[in-house]
């Protein structure tokens, strides 16, 4: 009996080690907004958050960085989180593009019709707004001296290229264009006008008080995330989405578990299933530890497998 007991104990230990990564996972995809969510106010990933995200990836959860930033600006964060090693994804430009972090394959993409660029430039000039777009590791703009554009370039490690004739210089279909002004009322007025004028052609929204974003029609984080779920064969119930801003509301509502950061506006919190701590208080780590790490249960080991292993122990 003693030898049999030792044999069974040895078998259980062996099989638990063998199956340590085969855990029952309720959630398979973790979608994270970046600025104000993944990053603290110093634009850094905290040690606790980094450790938690590496842990859940080791457990089999795949991570999506979902941001308004350009793809190039998200790559250093993807590398830090080792998304390429764990089958993660980058959802950039607020949903205009999704790439596989492992091999750079574009899984989803929508771009602005270049024929719309002269119209956008005309409206920007008429209102005295700066205008820019992204291209690979550069920003193309008619206003390189603009403080907000310079900050955007620094944040994403991009070079600024000045082009006086913006629409003539942009000889490609951009994922999105940005109009920039400190006149918030004027930006709001153009946003309202364009929502009526461009309905069905382009979508516009303000991501910051000084930024008016122009993207292809029907593009947001949720719609693009839905396309990714189709590619992966996953259900929305298997998704956790975490965000802090108005641009994150649709993906928070789409996810099986939608989480708002503690510093979010009340309107964002109202759409969430759960409110975590702020980005200055490791809110992502708190959410992940509660929703994933503490909820995981070891996979069941079939009795016949246990008995078979016991016979050979």
Please describe what each predicted stretch is.
Residues 1-24:
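Short, Lys/Arg-enriched N-terminal segments with co-localized hydrophobic residues
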Residues 56, 67, 94, 177, ...:
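Residue-level signal for inorganic ion chemistry
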Residues 25-29, 46, 213-313:
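Mg2+-dependent phosphoryl-transfer enzymes with acidic/Ser/Thr/Gly-rich catalytic loops
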Residues 81, 86, 94, 198-200, ...:
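Short, structured coil segments at secondary-structure junctions
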Residues 28-41:
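Asp-based phosphoryl-transfer active-site loop
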Residues 10, 123-242, 246, 254:
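Conserved acidic, metal-coordinating active-site core of Asp-based
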Residues 49, 74-78, 190, 194, ...:
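Hydrophobic packing residues within well-ordered alpha-helices of enzyme cores
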Residues 47-148:
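Active-site phosphate-binding/coordination module
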């Amino acid at each position: 009996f003693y030898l049999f007991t030792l044999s069974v104990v040895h078998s259980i230990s062996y099989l638990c080690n063998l199956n340590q990564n085969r855990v029952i996972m309720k959630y398979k995809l973790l979608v994270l907004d970046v600025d104000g969510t993944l990053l603290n106010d110093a634009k850094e990933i905290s040690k606790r958050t980094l450790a938690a995200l590496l842990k859940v990836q080791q457990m089999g959860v795949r991570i999506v960085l979902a941001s308004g930033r350009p793809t190039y600006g998200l790559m250093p964060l993807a590398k830090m989180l080792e998304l390429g090693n764990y089958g993660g994804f980058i959802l950039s430009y607020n949903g205009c593009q999704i790439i596989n972090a492992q091999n750079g394959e574009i899984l989803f993409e929508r771009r602005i019709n270049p024929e719309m660029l002269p119209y956008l430039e005309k409206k920007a000039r008429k209102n005295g707004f700066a205008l820019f777009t992204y291209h690979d590791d550069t920003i193309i703009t008619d206003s390189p001296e603009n403080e907000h554009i310079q900050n955007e370039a620094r944040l994403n490690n991009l070079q600024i290229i000045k082009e006086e004739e913006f629409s003539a210089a942009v000889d490609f279909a951009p994922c999105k264009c940005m109009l920039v002004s400190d006149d918030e009322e004027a930006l709001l007025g153009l946003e309202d006008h364009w929502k009526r004028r461009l309905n069905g052609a382009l979508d516009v929204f303000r991501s910051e008080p000084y930024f008016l974003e122009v993207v292809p029609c029907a593009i947001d984080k949720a719609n693009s995330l839905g396309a990714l779920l189709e590619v992966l064969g996953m259900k929305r119930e298997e998704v956790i989405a975490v965000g802090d801003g108005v641009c994150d509301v649709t993906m928070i509502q789409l996810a099986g578990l939608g989480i708002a950061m503690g510093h979010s506006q009340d309107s964002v919190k109202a759409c969430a299933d759960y409110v975590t701590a702020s980005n200055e208080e490791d809110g992502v780590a708190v959410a992940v530890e509660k929703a994933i790490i503490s909820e995981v249960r070891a996979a069941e080991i079939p009795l016949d497998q246990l008995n078979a292993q016991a016979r050979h122990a």
